[in-house]
């Protein structure tokens, strides 16, 4: 009797489609968090795309402009800083909130969301909403840093009233640093004109704009100063802690999780 021939077939498993949509994709901590999350999910078998109105995110992960985003009933939607029309129907809708007062959830109809993700306990307590929610910290980049010992300090983040950039400059110069590099975009021109421009004009501060390469940015400074009025997580502090960079500012005391831990928290939420 001839042996019976059997053929094994592998049935491909369709990847779950995740679409991250934000109304802000200029440089910043929130945009970096979304880029890192997109790459993390794609590395672990999801089909994830990050959509937004600006161009900065487009070459850093699987991404597209927001007008290319088509949502359907099989999609998992993660939305940030944007109100999605109620008539949009998806498999699951998660609100990813990085903000406090600029996006107060008590003023938003939260019934359309299946869950809400905060980045820290203090932020969740500030928002104080009675809805299903999780706390998932963002990925913190691990940066190699060598102290240039150059008497130059850095201030990282947008230049605006909330960041209190002028106080960071004043503290750094008062501590003996010769110059302060400002890595960030001017988001508040009146604030800049009234409080920061004088430091730039005197040569004590230099507008260094946003730097895409974190190792190049941190490698130019001997310390980092931070004076923000409100932080939900504190990504700059966390990056400095992991790299051993002197950080001068109020601590958020935030947990820093490994990528695998962060992925597992999202995996539990998406399924």
Q: Which residues are covered by each model-predicted region?
A:
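N-terminal pre-catalytic "stem/leader" segment of glycosyltransferase-like enzymes
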Residues: 1-73
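Extended catalytic core of nucleotide-activated donor transferases of GT-like folds
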Residues: 4-6, 57-114, 118
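Conserved donor-binding/catalytic core segment of Leloir-type glycosyltransferases
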Residues: 19, 140-163, 169-175, 180-181
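Glycosyltransferase donor-sugar binding loop
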Residues: 52-56, 179-193
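Donor nucleotide-sugar binding/catalytic pocket of nucleotide-sugar-dependent glycosyltransferases
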Residues: 112-144
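Nucleotide-activated donor-binding/catalytic signature segment of Leloir-type glycosyltransferases, i.e.
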Residues: 193-211
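Short alpha-helical donor nucleotide-sugar binding micro-motif in glycosyltransferases
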Residues: 210-211, 216-221
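Aromatic "clamp/platform" in nucleotide-sugar-dependent glycosyltransferases that forms part
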Residues: 229
């Amino acid at each position: 009797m001839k042996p019976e021939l059997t053929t094994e077939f592998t049935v491909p498993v369709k990847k779950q489609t995740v679409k991250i949509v934000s109304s802000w994709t200029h440089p910043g901590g929130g945009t970096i968090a979304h880029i890192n999350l997109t790459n993390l999910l794609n590395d672990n078998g999801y089909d994830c795309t990050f959509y937004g109105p600006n161009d900065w995110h487009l070459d850093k992960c699987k991404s597209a402009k927001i007008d290319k985003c088509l949502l359907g009933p099989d999609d998992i939607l993660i939305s940030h800083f944007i109100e999605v029309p109620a008539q949009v129907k998806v498999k699951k809708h998660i609100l990813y909130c990085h903000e406090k007062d600029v996006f107060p959830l008590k003023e938003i109809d939260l019934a359309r969301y299946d869950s809400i993700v905060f980045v820290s306990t203090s932020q969740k307590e500030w928002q104080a909403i009675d809805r299903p929610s999780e706390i998932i910290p963002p990925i913190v980049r691990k940066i190699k840093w060598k102290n240039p010992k150059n008497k130059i300090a850095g201030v990282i983040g947008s230049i605006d009233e909330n960041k209190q950039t002028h106080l960071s400059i004043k503290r750094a110069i008062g501590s003996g640093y010769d110059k302060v590099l400002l890595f960030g975009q001017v988001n508040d021109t009146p604030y800049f004109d009234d409080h920061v421009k004088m430091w730039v004009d005197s040569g004590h501060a230099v507008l260094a704009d946003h730097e895409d390469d974190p190792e190049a940015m941190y490698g130019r400074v001997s310390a980092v100063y931070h004076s923000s009025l409100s932080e939900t997580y504190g990504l700059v502090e966390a990056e400095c802690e992991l790299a051993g960079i002197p950080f001068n500012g109020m601590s958020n005391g935030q947990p820093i999780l490994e990528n695998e831990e962060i992925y597992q928290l999202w995996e539990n939420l998406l399924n």
